[in-house]
């Protein structure tokens, strides 16, 4: 990853090895990473050369790349330690994940850690033109007061239009309505889907930690965790482990980090969409092969 920024990253391998001499409990088991589908990358023709070191060289799957979950585990543990240290210093965070698989996880992780978040459309200028965004927040607050009074003085049609406008403002602004200053660290779930957010963060010198799949350049952000960024289970696991690091400094319970496998519930299988179910079925044979290799 972008190791030149030494105030943010150093050596994941060195940090994890040092920790594991103190405790044999990993931040999350490889079995749980397999269950989450964290190893499943994109089609081979979509790969980015800078992700080569994180891809399993053996041809376990003819069509798609397989991410090395040993490295996923190491980089995730390092990211957890990094976030914990930053949170202990009072650093502020913003979680960003606007695609379907990430929305719910990002919102819930941010809310339980009292962090900012964007889970709907990223509004241009959220970080680079914050005064305009805050004017929208002010407008939302004004409409809230009118709504509390039943939109008194407005016709039924006008009230319906104002309520529709208010609902849209809440959808886009609820996660940043309490932003009094710019966040210092961004946690992002998809480098492609949320590239505008990343561009704005870099302009404002906000540090970025995120999930990097096989189709992206990991050096675009300050620290990346190699993993599947399309599976809701993978996103859920990784984002909540990072949120646990913040929660720990707030004296709150850890949900996923350093927990037994049977205590980690990734998602309700009935909530999975057909596209994700198909992806998981396709990955099943690969998972079996990886499990066999890990046990050898």
Curated annotation (Swiss-Prot):
InterPro entries: Ribosomal_uS2, Ribosomal_uS2_bac/mit/plastid, Ribosomal_uS2_flav_dom_sf. Disulfide bonds: none annotated. This is Small ribosomal subunit protein uS2. PANTHER family: 30S RIBOSOMAL PROTEIN S2 PROKARYOTIC AND ORGANELLAR, SMALL RIBOSOMAL SUBUNIT PROTEIN US2M. GO terms for biological process: translation. Keywords: Ribonucleoprotein, Ribosomal protein. The keyword Kinase does not apply. GO terms for cellular component: small ribosomal subunit. Residues 1-24, 270-296 are annotated as: Disordered. Belongs to the universal ribosomal protein uS2 family. One of its GO terms (molecular function) is structural constituent of ribosome.
């Amino acid at each position: 990853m972008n190791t030149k920024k030494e105030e943010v990253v150093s050596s994941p391998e060195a940090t994890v090895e040092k920790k594991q001499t103190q405790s044999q409990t990993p931040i999350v088991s490889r079995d749980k990473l397999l269950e989450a589908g964290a190893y499943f990358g994109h089609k081979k023709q979509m790969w980015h050369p800078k992700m080569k070191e994180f891809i399993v060289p053996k041809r376990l799957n003819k069509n798609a790349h397989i991410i090395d979950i040993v490295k996923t585990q190491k980089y995730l543990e390092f990211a957890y330690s990094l976030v914990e240290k930053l949170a202990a210093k009072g650093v502020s965070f913003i979680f960003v994940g606007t695609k379907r698989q990430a929305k719910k996880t990002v919102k819930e992780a941010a809310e339980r850690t009292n962090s900012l978040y964007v889970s709907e459309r990223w509004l241009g200028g959220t970080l680079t033109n914050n005064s305009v965004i805050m004017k929208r927040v002010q407008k939302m607050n004004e409409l809230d007061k009118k709504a509390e009074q039943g939109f008194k003085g407005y016709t039924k049609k006008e009230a319906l239009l104002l309520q529709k406008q208010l609902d849209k403002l809440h959808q886009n602004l609820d996660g940043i309505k309490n932003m009094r200053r710019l966040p210092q660290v961004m946690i992002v779930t998809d480098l492609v889907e949320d590239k505008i957010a990343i561009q704005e963060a870099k302009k404002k010198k906000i540090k970025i930690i995120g999930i990097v799949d096989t189709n992206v350049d990991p050096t675009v952000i300050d620290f990346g965790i190699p993993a599947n960024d399309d599976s809701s289970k993978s996103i859920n696991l990784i984002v909540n482990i990072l949120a646990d690091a913040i929660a720990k400094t707030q004296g709150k319970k850890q949900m996923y980090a350093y927990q037994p496998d049977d205590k980690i519930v990734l998602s309700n299988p009935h909530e999975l969409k057909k596209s994700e179910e198909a992806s998981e079925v396709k990955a099943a044979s690969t998972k079996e092969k990886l499990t066999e290799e890990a046990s050898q």
